Amino acid sequence: MAPTMLVLLVPPFPVARGLLRNCWKQLQGKLLQSRPGFSSPPWGPALAVQGPAIFSEPTNDTSGSTETSSLLDSIFWMAAPKNRRSIEVNRCRRRNPHKLIKVKNNIDFCPECGHLKQKHVLCGYCYEKVRKETAEIRRQIGKQEGGPFKAPTVETVVLYSGETPSEHDQGKRIIERERKRPSWFTQN
């Protein structure tokens, strides 16, 4: 049995000092009774909770259910709705002005193609054109290289029909396309 140590702080008030002295004497008496050879009730922490009868000890159920009830089961039942919402309340919730779709005032026309788009956002139609042209260029590069890991470590230049390589294009990989350069694809 490990030795225990109790630290007492003596309060300055005489009434509290007397109460503390009485408690200390009772504790000493109980500790002396609990020595080996004396029978005493087991010491240990105890928890006393006042609650509804739902939390009392479960009765022996012989119906064969192996499921034990717990505190969480009753908490989940407490969180269930008790009354049905009226149709008026539901309508107010559904038609709340904060839940309605907000009108967008940042819609503009694309200067290239004329389709509607959001301001400061690339037009979806123009983006699709760029994506298709880029996919064609990548497909042609794949045919020219012969594999995904055989790419040279030089810069790539795309030349369309009727264009010739300039002095800056010397030593670069040149991809030639057999069509006219699109207006949105600049040469530099």
Swiss-Prot record:
Q: Name one GO cellular component term.
A: mitochondrial inner membrane
Residues at which Zn(2+) binds? 110, 113, 123, 126
Ordered alphabetically, the record's keywords are: Metal-binding, Mitochondrion, Ribonucleoprotein, Ribosomal protein, Transit peptide, Zinc
The protein's location, in the record's own words, is: Mitochondrion
> What would you give as a GO molecular function for this chain, any one?
metal ion binding
The post-translation modification note in this UniProt entry reads: MRPL32 precursor is processed by the m-AAA protease (composed of AFG3L2 and SPG7), which cleaves the N-terminal transit peptide. Cleavage by the m-AAA protease takes place prior to assembly into the large subunit, an essential step for mitochondrial ribosome (mitoribosome) assembly. Proper processing by the m-AAA protease is dependent on the zinc-binding region within the tightly folded C-terminal domain of MRPL32: zinc-dependent folding halts degradation initiated from the N-terminus and triggers the release of mature MRPL32.
Reply yes or no: does the keyword Amino-acid biosynthesis apply: no
Which InterPro entries does this chain map to?
Mitoribosomal_protein_bL32, Ribosomal_bL32, Ribosomal_zn-bd
Q: Where is this region: Disordered?
A: 162-188
Q: Which domain of life is it from?
A: Eukaryota
Residue ranges with Basic and acidic residues bias: 165-181
* Job description of the protein: Component of the mitochondrial large ribosomal subunit (mt-LSU). The mitochondrial ribosome (mitoribosome) is a large ribonucleoprotein complex responsible for the synthesis of proteins inside mitochondria.
Q: Which family does it belong to?
A: Belongs to the bacterial ribosomal protein bL32 family.
State how it assembles: Component of the mitochondrial ribosome large subunit (39S) which comprises a 16S rRNA and about 50 distinct proteins.
Which NCBIfam families does the entry mention? rpmF_bact (TIGR01031)
By what name is this protein known?
Answer: Large ribosomal subunit protein bL32m
Q: Which organism is it from?
A: Bos taurus (Bovine)
Gene that encodes the chain = MRPL32
